[in-house]
Swiss-Prot record:
UniProt site positions, description: Interaction with the intermediate capsid protein VP6: F232, M236, M849, M851
Domain of life: Viruses
Compositionally biased residues, Basic and acidic residues: 9-26
Protein's UniProt name: Inner capsid protein VP2
Region of interest (5-fold hub), ranges: 1-88
Keywords tagged on the record: Capsid protein, Inner capsid protein, Repeat, RNA-binding, T=2 icosahedral capsid protein, Ubl conjugation, Virion
Pfam assignment, any one: Rota_VP2
Organism the protein comes from: Rotavirus A (strain RVA/Human/Japan/YO/1977/G3P1A[8]) (RV-A)
Keyword Repeat in annotation: yes
Domain remark in the UniProt entry: The N-terminus binds RNA. It is necessary for encapsidation of VP1 and VP3. The N-termini of 10 VP2 molecules form a cylindrical hub underneath each 5-fold axis of the inner capsid.
PTM field: Sumoylated with SUMO1 and SUMO2. Sumoylation of viral proteins seems to have a positive role on viral replication.
Cellular component aspect of the GO annotation: T=2 icosahedral viral capsid; viral inner capsid; viral nucleocapsid
Length: 890
């Protein structure tokens, strides 16, 4: 922007046209210029006072320079020519500024907000059945000669038999089983919800769940069931102790399943709920805030229960060296915070039209086309003011870093920026953006006022421009204001166990605005000795516009502080402050809009909004801690199960997926492994540790109930005779390994040293390879005879590949369709392999009948705040922490 020389008066006022007449400029030229100027003023005045917000433009013809002016040699005409030449460039800056502000700076990401709000406490699910791994099944009994008897026998088998072969894979199966139990582990059990009628009961009794009822039916109908057991089933019913609110239900469970369910019943997370707990659940600062009137609607019954949320703090310190993860968390918090910050609607703001008209009068914009003050009105609208208000509060609540966008030639933006830097702590801004804004304020306003040379700032200087200026400026008020900004930091205060970032008391009560105004008044009184008069006047008028709204700025500062602190009371995770990877853009023109349009109407969050914000924060925080506990338990279990090939990164990925808000594939690997290392350092939560120990103690029992795998194989060069087995008939099964040399199959495969086996086999010594192997059955006698002469292990020893071993279970019994082929009882079937298979646990009704105890009834409430009715005082009467109205300017 080109400026006139000192002492040169404005040329487009009527008095100046008279002078041009006196100085022998032709009358026609004067009339033409005067008409053009009048028309231009009229058009621009209409546009400024119009309710429509539109870009101010000039008629293109006006930019063409008149031939008469070109030919004129007068000094005034030359200066006018210079101004008109630069006006087009200046207009582009104005249009850019307006365009920047009319484009919305924030697009709400509904998907992230929905993910956050959809995180619900899992305890809301009702448990409709007991946890079971086993179920009883009937298996036939075989005679000594291999014929099947008519009798049956009951054994415990796996409900879902998916056991893989291979010791390592079996251990991985148990890890997956553990993970499944952690997901399904109920926070509470109410047996009354799942109880069903016992069809065989003589007095309409109930048993604990449908599976128990089905087992009872099957046993009752089994011909071999003893009469005493039938009579017992007929007597099975619940036992109620109403005075103690307790009920006992009969159940039929495998001892391991009973141990799990008994543990779940004895370690429920529900706690008694009463009015006092609900009232204490409300954040203390909301309870004690006189602007909110809270009341309990009803008393709770003695059977009311709730699950205390898990709100442990900073177990992983995601703010420390996890840039991508922290950026995602703060972004989610920012989107959530924006949704709860109250809106400054048009009725709460000063009328944009009236305010722009008043500003035009203050600026005396009769010479609108050639004054730099034109930009002061650019982009002022209520939408921008509301956007700025929400951005400032939401960014502080989520500790999101902001970056500033501004045009240096718009002095009004920079003066508004001085208010912004006064009120918002420096840490909230990207350092480079903060330095650029401070440097623009110093070199545009502060240093020119005192006639000081421009500041040449070295990139990378540890000091900010304001810190350098504070040491160089002699004026007390300005230096004092700079000192305040340079030391404006959040104060970290722990309130209710949560680290809060609180504002300086001078900001909270608005007194800092007086300090800002003193500095601005001092600057406006300076002479700007090295700058043109117009420059000084533009700065002074910008300061005048802001200083005219001193009362409103104090109120605005108090309003921002109050809304920030009230919403901050609903945050449950520590507010750690770290500069974020991405930033939220803030236009300084929107700050101008906020400063100029803020009215005297108080807006505070509604109680329902506060409760919603609090509930979402609690649910996310609690889910975050529960998922940490799951991940820590799985990592510990993987180590204790010696899963040396397990990719820990997959456990960390599952952990992040269950937190809902992360785009896991985009998280850098270094942060994944760092997260793994931090998870490894955490202790396992007690309930999860106990459950894992239960699995660890019973792995063998679970494994032997599977029909998919055997526990080893005995191999020999000499044929071994098939033996009778009660469950399978004549088969090559061994039920124990007594007398055999044992070698661990997994170790053998890892080392690859088969010499020991080869030597033993060559010496005609059978050897037992112990490990989980496929339990393959083949009852076709034809295929059996085809394989009898084959030496099963010879090929394996030759190839040295033990993992290809598929031991075969040979069945020769009366079930075979080809049984007539082996009617010659002199023939003795043999095999060079014997499958080692442990005997599953027989089903014993008496040992499997357990009485389970739980409360007869209780009601679990997940939304505690639904019992609280809340209202606010009239917003105009709302008071801040200092017991004065938030908005004093009426």
């Amino acid at each position: 922007m080109a400026y006139r020389k000192r002492g040169v008066k404005r040329e487009n006022l009527p008095q100046q046209h008279e002078r041009l007449q006196e100085k022998e400029i032709e009358n026609n030229t004067d009339v033409t210029m005067e008409n053009k100027n009048n028309n231009r003023k009229q058009q621009l005045s209409d546009k400024v006072l119009s309710q429509k917000e539109e870009i101010i433009t000039d008629v293109q013809d006006d930019i063409k320079i008149a031939d008469e002016v070109k030919k004129s040699s007068k000094e005034e005409s030359k200066q006018l020519l210079e101004i008109l030449k630069t006006k087009e460039d200046h207009q582009k800056e104005v249009q850019y500024e307006i365009l920047q502000k009319t484009i919305p700076t924030f697009e709400p990401k509904e998907s992230i907000l929905k993910k956050l709000e959809d995180i619900r406490p899992e305890q809301a699910k009702k448990q409709m059945k007991l946890f079971r791994i086993f179920e009883p099944r009937q298996l036939p009994i075989y005679r000594t000669n291999g014929e099947k008897e008519l009798r049956n026998r009951w054994y415990w088998k796996l409900k879902k038999d998916t056991l893989p072969d291979g010791d390592y894979d079996v251990r991985e199966y148990f890890l997956n089983l553990y993970d499944q139990i952690l997901i399904e582990m109920p926070d509470y059990l109410l047996l009354k919800d799942m109880a069903v009628e016992n069809k065989n009961s003589r007095d309409a009794g109930k048993v604990v769940d449908s599976e128990t009822a089905n087992i009872c039916d099957a046993i009752f109908q089994d011909e071999e069931t003893e009469g005493v057991i039938r009579r017992f089933i007929a007597d099975m019913r619940q036992q109620v102790q109403a005075d103690r609110n307790i009920v006992n239900y009969p159940s039929i469970l495998h001892p391991i399943d009973h141990a799990f369910n008994e543990y779940f019943l004895n370690h429920q997370l529900v706690e008694p709920l009463n009015n006092e707990i609900i009232f204490n659940y409300i954040p203390e600062r909301i309870r004690n805030d006189v602007n909110y009137i809270l009341n309990m609607d009803m008393n709770l019954p003695s059977t009311a229960r709730y699950i205390r949320p898990n709100l442990l703090q900073d177990r992983l310190n995601l703010h420390d060296n996890f840039e991508s993860l922290w950026d995602t968390i703060t972004t989610s918090n920012y989107i959530l915070a924006r949704s709860v910050v109250p809106d400054l609607k048009e009725k709460e703001l000063v009328s944009t039209e009236a305010q722009i008209q008043k500003m035009s009068q203050d600026l005396q914009l009769e010479a609108l086309t050639i004054q730099s003050e034109t930009q002061f009105l650019a982009g002022i609208n209520s939408q921008a003011a509301n956007d700025c208000f929400k951005t400032l509060i939401a960014a502080m609540l989520s500790q999101r870093t902001m970056s500033l966008d501004f045009v240096t030639t718009n002095y009004m933006s920079l003066i508004s920026g001085m208010w912004l830097l006064t009120v918002i702590p420096n840490d909230m801004f990207l350092r480079e953006s903060l330095v650029a804004c401070e440097l623009a304020i110093i070199n545009t306003i502060v240093y020119p006022a005192f006639g000081m040379q421009r500041m040449h700032y070295r990139n990378g200087d540890p000091q900010t421009p304001f810190q350098i200026a504070e040491q160089q400026i002699q004026n007390f008020q300005v230096a004092n204001w700079l000192h305040f900004i340079n030391n404006n930091r959040f104060r970290q205060v722990v309130i209710d166990g949560v680290l809060n970032q609180t504002l300086n008391d001078n900001i909270r009560n608005g007194q800092v605005i007086n300090q800002l105004m003193e500095a601005l008044m001092q600057l406006s009184r300076q002479q700007f000795p090295t700058m043109p008069v117009d420059y000084k006047r533009s700065i002074q008028r910008g300061i005048l516009l802001l200083s005219n709204r001193l009362g409103q700025l104090v109120d605005l500062t108090r309003l921002v502080s109050y809304n920030y602190e009230t919403l901050m009371a609903c945050i449950t995770m520590n507010m750690q402050h770290v500069q974020t990877l991405t930033t939220e853009k803030l236009q300084l023109t929107s700050v101008t809009s906020l400063c100029m349009l803020i009215g005297n109407t108080t807006v505070i969050p509604s109680p329902q909004t506060l409760f919603h914000y609090y509930n979402v924060n609690v649910n996310f925080h609690s889910n975050y801690n529960e998922r940490i506990n799951d991940a820590v338990a799985i990592i510990t279990a993987a180590n204790r199960l010696n899963l040396y090939q397990k990719k820990m990164k997959s456990i960390v990925e599952d952990f992040l997926k269950r937190l809902q808000i992360f785009d896991v594939p985009r998280v850098p690997d270094d942060q994944m492994y760092r997260l793994r290392d931090r998870l490894r350092l955490l202790p396992v939560e007690r309930r999860r540790l106990d459950i894992f120990n239960l699995i660890l103690m019973n792995m063998e029992q679970i494994e032997r109930a599977s029909d998919k795998i055997a526990q080893g194989v005995i191999i020999a060069y000499r044929d071994m005779q098939l033996e009778r087995d009660e469950m399978y008939g004549f088969v090559n099964i061994a039920r124990n390994l007594d007398g055999y040399q044992q070698i661990n199959l997994e170790e053998l495969m890892r080392t690859g040293d088969y010499g020991q086996i080869t030597n033993m086999l060559l010496n005609n010594q059978p050897v037992a390879l112990v490990g989980a192997l496929p339990f393959v059955t083949d009852s076709s006698v034809i295929s059996l005879i085809a394989k009898l002469d084959a030496t099963v292990f010879a090929q394996i020893v030759k190839l040295r590949k033990v993992d290809t071993l598929k031991p075969i279970l040979y069945k020769i019994n009366s079930d075979s369709n080809d049984f007539y082929l082996v009617a010659n009882y002199d023939w003795i079937p043999t095999s060079t392999t014997k499958v080692y298979k442990q005997v599953p646990q027989p089903f014993d009704f008496r040992a499997s009948m357990h009485m389970l105890t739980s409360n007869l009834t209780f009601t679990v409430y997940s939304d505690l705040l639904s019992f609280v009715s809340a209202d606010t005082v009239e917003p105009i009467n709302a008071i801040a922490f200092d017991n004065m109205r938030i908005m004093n300017e009426l």
